[in-house]
Curated annotation (Swiss-Prot):
Gene Ontology MF terms: GTP binding; hydrolase activity; mRNA 5'-cap (guanine-N7-)-methyltransferase activity; mRNA guanylyltransferase activity; RNA binding
Name of the protein this chain belongs to: Protein VP3
InterPro entries with a match to the protein in the record: VP3_Rotav
Annotated stretches, region: GTase/RTPase activity: 556-692
Nucleotidyltransferase found in the keyword field: yes
Compartments in which it is found: Virion
Region of interest (2'-O-methyltransferase activity), residue spans: 246-428
Location of region: N7-methyltransferase activity: 171-245, 429-555
Length: 835
């Protein structure tokens, strides 16, 4: 959902759009809540309040002030991520296809021959990091840039087995135009760029688990973050390979040698970071043209010093000359060295050229060893060729994608590698490595062990759900790690499947009830965005590969109505009730009937079941941004800090009733996941609340009326306002509560309209207008540790006779209270009060 705030209405009508006029009779929170539960995707918010916009944005719902028709058109036509702190809108808008255009935010691609393989009449446009260069297209009151690019298609092509780029591109664009937008992936880079600076500013030691290539630029500014990935392919792993021959396979129609070099250097930088936690100087031999340096510098400031007889235009310092063994002493400590020296074959005889290449490989290794043998804080990435070679068994082998699979590969060496054992590797084994192994990640750090790290802040986004990990170990880590942001795949199946297929692996699935946490927030992607200064126009889909975001050690835990709050909790219910259900009251009716309350008169205003909890359970796939467990816990300990809105404190029994209704709903829907979730939430409610039941009561609270509009044969027809199980020395406490509640009790507007047989030989009249006061009374008794109410639902009624009678219906009649009293069952009245 997106909320576009306008000062004036617009004449044009837009699809899937609704207008909301700010209600001055309600505060900003109540207006925000009402907006969040509207069912259309676009909300035009008139006479808006800035505070209401802020509330929505902090809840993860994109809400933007719009000052002109151009701004409105730009935002209503596409989805976007909004940085509400810095007032930047990141559009995810692919309408540029109508210009016969694809876009990239990687400069090196523009220097290739990719243009020869685009769709006929199409062009490639470089738009800068996250589309920053497009800012000039939008002369708006807020900063606006289009972050949509086709880099995902280009990179997927590079790693695919397909060679025809034009066909691949065409298929992917058609897929993009016919499937829902992968909004989380599109906004994830914006999120990471917002998330990690804020974490690093607060926490000295940060661990990041499972980064992939899409994060390769994000972390260049954070050398102190310790990365964990899937580990490196090292020389000793080649022992498993059988010898092969030269393959010579074409990988890409257009030249991606630049991409390969960039990946090699970035891999080396992150390897250096994990050893030394600082930025290195970057030396490169055989550097020309290295257009990708421009891309690196768009993200982070590095010093590049390069050697090559040809130009390297984006280098900090370039030496237009060859580099020799004797020049190694020019290279300083605290650096990385990338050696990419190889003579081009040209028209040279193959055998002669092969001899030169092997000599250069030995020379490259000698330079690498000499560089690493002196000084400190050094890492080298060196170009090698498939030949009989001795290499350190701990050397890291790289084979990032390049235009053709031929005979080249790379090795990363550190100062410890050069003093470890070397192993002879025959040429055929290196060919087996080149032919069968593609390095898919610039992060080659060791795997993360599922253990807590008390002094570190752990970030693990989309990294731990894989069934290679022990599910219980993942749960234990989340339960015990004091400071972290960890995601796990949500169980949004209908058969309560413990793990689900994802690509070529399986993921464990989780529900919020799998974790035992305090001071932690469990929310969705959009709920998490709101906590870190962002909001989004399209929330996560109810099915598919979605994740719970679990934030441990946050200072926002107590801010219940600001973050991961109840905004939108009824939205799915509204969509169903007002479109396909039997009546818009269907939810109210079902909740009462499923708890054996058959008096449906006024069910939409007088109900015994928490609608919040009920909707949060049965539609959890749609509204898990709302942290239900946190909401329950803070209520249970009486620490609900509320800034505004229409606040109603639920009695714990109302939450139990909601769980019972949700369980019956789940059974009817054959939804085993909701059934378990509702059972576990009910168990959690019973755990955090000390609920006791007066199922064998000894006292009751009665209400006597001036008159009853029915015939009766009991001595005094009365409404039992509740039963208690108390000792005699608690009578004073009960009376104190009744006196505090006196005004509210006598203000009850009780009415009756029919009689019925409650059970065999029990003839009663209905009583409406009681429940809201009953639950307030329940809460007061609960806080005073007085057992009040039974385990079955309280159904207000007035007993008229203990014999079978003919039921009657009358016009709704108000009943005037005469007195309210406390009486021992089968005993005497111990307290009586009148108005």
């Amino acid at each position: 959902m997106k909320v576009l705030a306008l000062r004036h209405s617009v004449a044009q009508v837009y699809a899937d759009t609704q207008t909301y006029l700010h209600d001055d009779s309600k505060d900003e929170y109540e207006n925000a809540f009402l907006i969040s539960n509207l069912t259309t995707h676009n909300i035009l918010y008139l006479n808006y309040s800035l505070k209401t916009l802020k509330i929505l944005n902090k809840s993860g719902i994109a809400a933007v002030e719009v000052q002109s028709p151009d701004e409105l058109f730009a935002l209503i036509r596409c989805n976007f991520t909004y940085d509400y702190e810095d007032n930047i809108v990141y559009l995810h808008d692919y309408s540029y296809y109508t210009n016969n255009e694809i876009r990239t935010d990687q400069h090196w691609i523009t220097k290739t021959d990719i243009i020869d393989y685009l769709l006929p009449g199409w062009k490639l446009t470089y738009v800068g990091y996250n589309g920053k260069n497009t800012r000039g297209h939008y002369n708006f009151s807020f900063i606006c840039q289009n972050a949509a690019t086709d880099d995902d298609i280009i990179i997927e092509y590079i790693y695919s087995n397909e060679l025809d780029f034009q066909n691949f591109l065409l298929r992917k664009i058609k897929e993009r135009m016919t499937t829902s937008l992968p909004i989380a992936r599109l906004s994830n880079r914006v999120f990471r760029d917002k998330l990690f600076p804020s974490i690093v500013n607060i926490h000295k030691k940060v661990i990041n688990v499972g980064p992939r290539n899409e994060s390769m630029f994000t972390f260049l500014n954070f050398p102190t973050i310790k990365q964990f990935s899937n580990g490196a392919y090292i020389v000793k792993h080649t022992i498993k390979l059988k010898q092969e021959k030269w393959l010579g396979k074409r990988v890409s129609q257009f030249d991606i040698g630049q991409y390969k070099n960039m990946l090699n250097v970035v891999t080396t930088i992150y390897y250096y970071y994990n050893l030394y936690y600082s930025k290195p100087i970057i030396y490169m031999l055989g550097s020309a043209p290295s257009y990708w340096i421009y891309d690196i510098k768009q993200y982070s400031d590095f010093t590049f010093e390069t050697w090559d007889p040809l130009d390297t235009p984006y280098s900090t310092t370039h030496h237009k000359e060859l580099f020799f063994d004797k020049d190694v002493n020019k290279l300083k400590d605290n650096s990385v060295l990338y050696i990419d020296i190889r003579t081009d074959r040209g028209n040279m005889d193959w055998k002669e050229w092969r001899k030169i290449v092997e000599q250069q490989t030995v020379s490259n290794l000698n330079i690498a060893y000499k560089y690493l043998s002196t000084g400190k804080a050094k890492v080298c990435c060196v170009k090698l060729t498939a030949m009989d070679l001795e290499l350190p068994i701990t050397a890291k082998l790289l084979h990032h994608p390049t235009t053709e699979v031929r005979s080249e590969f790379y090795a990363i060496l550190d100062v410890w590698d050069i003093i470890t054992i070397k192993r002879f590797i025959p040429k055929g084994v290196f060919y087996a490595f080149i032919n069968n192994v593609t390095t898919e990640n610039v992060f080659i750090q060791p795997p993360f062990k599922l253990k807590t790290s008390p002094t570190d802040y752990i970030v693990a986004l989309y990294a731990l759900s894989n069934d290679l990990n022990s599910r219980q170990d993942v749960i234990n880590l989340i339960n015990k790690q004091k400071q972290s942001l960890i995601t796990v795949r949500i169980n949004n199946t209908f058969k309560d499947e413990p793990k689900v297929n994802f690509k070529n692996i399986y993921d464990w699935t989780f529900l919020p009830t799998d974790f035992e946490l305090k001071d932690s927030i469990i929310t969705s992607y959009d709920g998490c965005l709101g906590i870190f200064g962002l909001s989004i126009s399209l929330s996560s889909k109810p099915t598919g590969n979605n994740h719970l975001f679990i934030i441990n050690g946050t200072d926002k835990y107590d801010k219940l109505d600001q973050y991961a709050n109840h905004m939108g909790v009824s939205r799915r219910s509204h969509q169903i009730r007002f479109s396909e259900s039997a009546t818009s009251y269907s939810g109210y009716i079902f909740r009462d009937l499923s708890n054996n309350n058959f008096n449906l008169i006024g069910t939409n205003v007088e109900n015994s079941v928490s609608g919040h909890v009920y909707n949060a359970l049965i539609y959890y796939r749609y509204n898990y941004a709302f942290d239900l467990k946190r909401w329950i816990y803070l209520h249970s300990i009486g620490k609900v800090a509320v800034e505004g809105g229409r606040y109603y404190e639920h009695a714990p029994i109302e939450l139990i009733y909601a769980c019972r209704s949700a369980k019956e709903f789940a059974i009817l829907q054959d939804d085993l996941t909701v059934l378990r979730y509702a059972n576990e939430i009910e168990g959690y409610i019973n755990k955090v609340y000390s609920i006791t039941y007066a199922d064998d009561p000894n006292y009751f609270i009665g209400i006597k009326f001036n008159s009853i509009p029915y015939e009766y044969d009991v001595k005094i027809p009365h409404l039992t306002l509740g039963v208690l199980f108390i000792s005699d020395n608690m009578i004073h406490d009960v009376i104190t509560v009744l006196k505090k509640m006196k005004t509210e009790l006598f203000k009850m507007e009780i009415s009756t309209s029919y009689t019925y047989m409650l059970s065999d030989n029990t003839y009663v009249a209905n009583a409406s207008g009681v429940l809201s006061t009953y639950f307030k009374l329940y809460n007061m008794f609960y806080r005073n540790h007085i057992t009040f109410g039974q385990s079955r639902m309280f159904i207000p009624h007035i007993t008229l006779s203990f014999s079978n009678k003919q039921t009657v219906r009358i016009e709704s009649t108000k009943l005037r209270i005469n007195s309210i009293y406390l009486r021992k069952i089968k005993g005497e009245t111990v307290f009586d009060m009148s108005e």
